Amino acid sequence: MKKALYGLVVLLLFSVVQFNVSDTFADKIGYKKIFTNNCQKCHGKDGKGTKRGKGLGVPNFTDSEWQDATTDKQMITAITNGKKKMPKQGHKLSPEEIKAVVKYIRFFAPK
């Protein structure tokens, strides 16, 4: 009986872990689409900034110091209202989409 219960617990834990991994991957894909369509032109596919973006002074999203120093709230405000030469996106993206972009930007953080 103990072995059966142990096996069931292990199976249940594996299912939960598998679900979370799949969920994270699916979220990342959705976030990537929003980023690609709205941000990539200046911020680059790799988050380091395109030539155009660097000329405009965009941050390097792969910089751990920038990631540590920048809060989600600061990013939400910048995306919503614009910042320096970056146009505001609050009229174009929903609050949920803006939060998705912030989550995607966090994927660029060095591991």
Language model features with spans:
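Periplasmic/extracellular electron-transfer cofactor-ligation site
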Residues: 32-57, 83-85, 107-111
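Electrostatic cytochrome c docking/interface patches
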Residues: 16-34, 50
